[in-house]
Each structure stands twice: as structure tokens, then as C-alpha cells.
């Protein structure tokens, strides 16, 4: 695991952001998102073992991948993980709580496959058939995957044109099968109660790989988390709805309080916003909030948010 394409910032910048990609991709999948984040933020996109330029020593191990990211972090950081990268981020936050200031999990999961205690999972994950296709012609099939995720996105061709050359240049990930096997075996549900940082969950309403019900499960289990479903997004909201996603993430990170509790006002229900008011300038969002955990005694509110403005 190595730190890659680090963007430098002002010397006094206090926020450090790490982006962790998903299965079958590499750090360049974030090439369209990074310029949309504040220029004062130091942002690093990393390659998971056996992806991009990162070497691969078998077996692919999620805990080891999380430890490798932690080794790069010298001060509590804001972590954004997509899909498999979100699973790695969960292990990172649970195993190295001193390294994580906040989490954003987009189109991710605590467990991928369903069982009798976890109906939110997939009955039969369909990613396996992509392994052979990626190995046969990675550039062709990663492009097709991106086109599917960006269906109906106005600037789809432009987005793909900006990220595909570097994404495809790295070639087929050497850990393709091993990383998929690890993702299908993984079960991070026992870690969720250990995570005590602000968490933003962003899911796509049309995502068939990690459907919104997986986000709802995480939202129930991660205390103080905030769930946002982008109704018309699929498995890559940060690509298909880049501006809205970047604004959402920017607001989240800026709202994280530098307090030991790590709580944010954004996670409080409307009644608690009366107790601790914060302006809401985005009435187009159909907002609901989780139960208050601040001890004020307010009753639980319906959970989750839906972004539907502007065709999102």
C-alpha cells in the first residue's frame, strides 16, 4: 500500500482527507472528485494492495489493508471509502480510532452477502462474472462499468474521458479475485458499535451492488450517523452526481467538531437543532434525522435523507 497522487495544501490546513477506492478500480477513480474539494484540504487517494501501482503480497487481507492506510496517517484524518474501500475504512476506524476524525462511506457495506440475520445483503453477489471480463480486457470493461454507473449523467463522456486513461493505464488489478473473495467473506458488523466518530453514509437509489438497504443497516448500527440516498445515482454517486456529492461531503467535513466526542450538529434531529441551532439553507432536501444521542430527551425521528433536487 502506498500513498498516491497527494494534493498539497496551505501549511496551516487542519483537515487531511484520505480517499479509498473500491474493488476493481484504483486511486484514479477519484480524479474527477478531487478538484471539486476545497483547495486548502490536503487530499490523498491511495491504492489498495494489488490495485493500481500498489504491490500485492497474497493473501488479500482487509485488516492488513486498513493497517497499511493507518500507517500513512500522522494526525486524525477524514476518511472517505467507496464500496470495498468503505469496508476497509470501517476496519480502519475500529482498529485505529486515534487515526480517524470522520468517516464517509459511499455505496459500501458491513457485510456483502445475506444470511438469516442479515437480509440486507445480496443473495448471490454478481461481481464474480466481472473478474473474467476484467482480466480479458480491463480497459474495455472498466469503461463499460463506468458507462453503466453514469447512465443519464449529462457529462458522462467528459467524466470518463478525464479518469479512464489513468484508471486503465494501471491495468488489471493483480488482486482482482482475491480482493473479491475477501469482500464476500468479510463481516464487519461486530465492529460497528466500536466506531465513535461522525459518519456520513451516501448511497445511490438505483444501486444494485450495494442497495440503499445496506446503508439503512449501517445507519441503524452506527451511532450518530447520517444517511443520504441520491435517488437517481447508482454505485458511484461521487462520479454520476459529482457536484452534489462534493458539496455534501464538504459540508459534512466542515461541520465536524474538533471535540473529543466528535459529534456534528448535522446528526441531530430538528428538535435538537432548536436546542443547538444551526442554519439549514437547503430546504430542497427532504430531511429527517436519527434519534438524539445528546441526552436532551427528544424522541426518535424517522431516519435518512433523500436528495431529489435538480434531478439528483
Curated annotation (Swiss-Prot):
GO molecular function: pimelyl-[acyl-carrier protein] methyl ester esterase activity
UniProt-listed Enzyme Commission number(s): 3.1.1.85
Domain of life: Bacteria
Pfam families in UniProt: Abhydrolase_1
KW Ligase (keyword) present: no
InterPro entries per UniProt: AB_hydrolase_1, AB_hydrolase_fold, AB_hydrolase_sf, BioH
Binding site for substrate: 23, 83-84, 145-149, 235
Domain AB hydrolase-1, first and last residues per copy: 17-241
Cellular-component GO terms for this entry: cytoplasm; membrane
Active site: 83, 207, 235
Database matches in Gene3D superfamilies: alpha/beta hydrolase (3.40.50.1820)
Primary location class: cytoplasm
Pathway: Cofactor biosynthesis; biotin biosynthesis
Enzyme class: hydrolase
Protein function: The physiological role of BioH is to remove the methyl group introduced by BioC when the pimeloyl moiety is complete. It allows to synthesize pimeloyl-ACP via the fatty acid synthetic pathway through the hydrolysis of the ester bonds of pimeloyl-ACP esters.
PANTHER family noted in UniProt: AB HYDROLASE SUPERFAMILY PROTEIN YCLE, MONOACYLGLYCEROL LIPASE
Subunit organization: Monomer.
Record protein name field: Pimeloyl-[acyl-carrier protein] methyl ester esterase
Source organism of this protein record: Neisseria meningitidis serogroup A / serotype 4A (strain DSM 15465 / Z2491)
Gene: bioH
Amino acid at each position: 500500500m502506498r500513498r498516491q497522487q497527494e494534493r498539497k495544501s496551505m501549511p496551516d490546513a487542519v483537515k487531511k482527507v484520505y480517499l479509498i477506492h473500491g474493488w476493481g478500480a484504483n486511486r484514479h477513480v477519484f480524479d474527477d472528485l478531487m478538484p471539486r474539494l476545497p483547495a486548502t484540504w490536503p487530499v490523498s487517494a491511495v491504492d489498495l494492495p494489488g490495485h493500481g501501482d500498489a504491490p500485492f503480497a497474497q493473501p488479500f487481507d482487509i485488516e492488513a489493508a486498513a493497517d497499511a492506510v493507518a500507517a500513512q496517517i500522522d494526525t486524525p484524518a477524514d476518511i472517505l471509502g467507496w464500496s470495498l474501500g468503505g469496508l476497509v475504512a470501517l476496519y480502519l476506524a475500529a482498529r485505529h480510532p486515534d487515526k480517524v476524525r470522520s468517516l464517509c462511506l459511499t455505496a459500501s457495506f458491513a457485510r456483502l452477502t445475506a444470511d438469516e440475520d442479515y437480509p440486507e445483503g445480496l443473495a448471490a453477489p454478481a461481481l464474480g462474472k466481472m473478474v473474467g471480463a476484467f482480466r480479458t480486457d480491463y480497459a474495455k470493461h472498466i469503461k463499460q462499468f463506468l458507462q453503466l454507473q453514469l447512465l443519464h449523467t449529462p457529462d458522462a463522456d467528459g467524466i470518463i474521458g478525464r479518469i479512464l486513461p489513468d484508471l486503465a493505464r494501471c491495468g488489471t488489478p493483480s488482486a482482482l479475485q482475491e480482493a473479491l473473495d475477501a469482500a464476500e467473506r468479510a463481516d464487519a458488523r461486530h465492529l460497528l458499535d466500536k466506531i465513535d466518530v461522525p459518519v456520513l453514509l451516501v448511497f445511490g437509489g438505483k444501486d444494485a451492488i450495494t442497495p440503499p438497504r445496506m446503508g439503512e443497516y449501517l445507519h441503524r448500527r452506527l451511532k450518530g450517523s447520517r444517511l443520504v440516498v441520491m435517488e437517481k445515482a447508482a454505485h458511484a454517486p461521487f462520479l454520476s452526481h459529482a457536484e452534489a456529492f462534493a458539496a455534501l461531503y464538504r459540508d459534512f467535513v466542515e461541520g465536524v467538531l474538533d471535540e473529543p466526542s466528535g459529534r456534528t450538529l448535522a446528526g441531530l434531529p430538528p428538535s435538537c437543532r432548536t436546542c443547538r441551532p444551526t442554519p439549514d439553507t437547503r430546504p430542497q432536501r427532504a430531511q429527517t434525522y436519527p434519534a438524539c444521542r445528546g441526552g436532551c430527551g427528544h424522541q426518535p425521528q424517522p431516519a435518512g435523507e433523500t436528495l431529489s433536487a435538480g434531478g439528483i
